[in-house]
C-alpha cells in the first residue's frame, strides 16, 4: 500500500475524530489552545495505537485466512464506511454536557478517543492481511488525525455543525472505495 492510499485511509479514519472535535469546539465557551491541543493529542494518539493493536491481532491469524484476506479487508472497510455514512445523518453533537475544562480530563477524553478510534482497530487488522508497513502507517494516521482534530475544534468554535456530516460522508465513501480497490486488485 502506497503513501497516497495510506493518506486517504488516514483522512477517512480521522473523520469520526474530526466530527467529535467539531462538537468539542462547538460547545467550548472560549477557544482555549490547551484544550484544542488535548483533543488533538488524544484523538491522534488513539488513532495511531488502535491500528497497531489491530495489526498485532491480525498477524496472529494471517496465515490461516490468507486466501480470503482481500474479502475480509473489503467487508471490514465497507462496513466501517457504510456505518460512517449512516452516522453522518445523526445529530449527536449536544452541548447539554459539561464542556468546561473538566470535560477535557483524562477519563472523558480517553472514552471519546476510544469511541472514535474503534474503526482504526479493524483497519489495523486489514493492514496485517495486506502486509502494510505498520510504523509509517500509524505515524501517518496519528499525525493526520492530530492535525484534523485541531482543525475540527477550530471549525466547531467558528462554524458549528455545518461540516460535521459532510466529513463523515466523505470518510465513509473513501473507506468503501479503498475496500473495493483492494478487492478488485486481488480478483483481477
Curated annotation (Swiss-Prot):
Q: Where in the cell is it found?
A: Cell membrane
Q: Which UniProt keywords apply?
A: Cell membrane, Ion transport, Manganese, Membrane, Transmembrane, Transmembrane helix, Transport
Q: Which GO terms describe its molecular function?
A: manganese ion transmembrane transporter activity
Q: Which GO terms describe its cellular component?
A: plasma membrane
What sections of the protein cross the membrane?
A: 2-22, 37-57, 65-85, 110-130, 138-158, 168-188
Q: How does it sit in the membrane?
A: Multi-pass membrane protein
Q: Does the keyword Ion transport apply?
A: yes
Q: Which family does it belong to?
A: Belongs to the MntP (TC 9.B.29) family.
Task: Sum up the protein's function in the record's words.
Answer: Probably functions as a manganese efflux pump.
- Cross-referenced PANTHER family, in alphabetical order? MANGANESE EFFLUX PUMP MNTP-RELATED
**What name is this protein filed under?**
Putative manganese efflux pump MntP
Amino acid at each position: 500500500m502506497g503513501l497516497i492510499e495510506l493518506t486517504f485511509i488516514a483522512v477517512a479514519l480521522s473523520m469520526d475524530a474530526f466530527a467529535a472535535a467539531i462538537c468539542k469546539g462547538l460547545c467550548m465557551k472560549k477557544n482555549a489552545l490547551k484544550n484544542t491541543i488535548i483533543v488533538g493529542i488524544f484523538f491522534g494518539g488513539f488513532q495511531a495505537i488502535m491500528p497497531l493493536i489491530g495489526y498485532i491481532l491480525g498477524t496472529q491469524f494471517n496465515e490461516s485466512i490468507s486466501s480470503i484476506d482481500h474479502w475480509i479487508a473489503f467487508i471490514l472497510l465497507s462496513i466501517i464506511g457504510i456505518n460512517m455514512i449512516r452516522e453522518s445523518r445523526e445529530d449527536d453533537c449536544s452541548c447539554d454536557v459539561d464542556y468546561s475544562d473538566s470535560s477535557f480530563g483524562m477519563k472523558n477524553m480517553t472514552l471519546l478517543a476510544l469511541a472514535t478510534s474503534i474503526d482504526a482497530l479493524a483497519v489495523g487488522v486489514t493492514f496485517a492481511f495486506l502486509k502494510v508497513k505498520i510504523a509509517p502507517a500509524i505515524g501517518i494516521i496519528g499525525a493526520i488525525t492530530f492535525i484534523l482534530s485541531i482543525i475540527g475544534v477550530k471549525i466547531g468554535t467558528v462554524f458549528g455543525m455545518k461540516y460535521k456530516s459532510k466529513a463523515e460522508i466523505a470518510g465513509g465513501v473513501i473507506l468503501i472505495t479503498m475496500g473495493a480497490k483492494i478487492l478488485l486488485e486481488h480478483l483481477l
